[in-house]
Amino acid sequence: MLKRNKRFLLMLLALALLFGCVGCSDGVSATYEKISGAEAKALMDSESGYIIIDARTQSEYDEGHILGAILIPEYEISARAEKELPDKDQLILVYCRSGRRSKIAAEELVKLGYTNVKDFGGIIDWEYEIVK
């Protein structure tokens, strides 16, 4: 009977330690925010010091892009972000054609430590000015 109690207490202690360590994390996982084109436009009109990233290809960018956007194709984000986006707390607005690549780019930026990333989807839904 005493052995059983000791085992039970040891198991309880082990579980308490396990759950205690799990609770040690701050519980905050970095993520990006998904916003609409209208919300992105409102930020562009009201904020300063933001960056707009076009996550499409060069040829898509050349066909038309949002004024002020810099081209960093989604597949180049990890290689170019540190150099071209030195401020990891700066507001970064990301778009592509339909929203698939902007999601991938936004996720990659967050993995790289960027803290203020907003994905506003695709240019096909953009109702505002486009430059060529």
State what each model feature region is.
Residues 52-54:
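Structural scaffold elements adjacent to functional motifs in cytosolic proteins
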Residues 13-18:
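Hydrophobic helical h-region of N-terminal Sec-dependent signal peptides
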Residues 2-8, 19-38, 43, 50, ...:
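Rhodanese-like catalytic fold shared by cysteine-dependent sulfurtransferases
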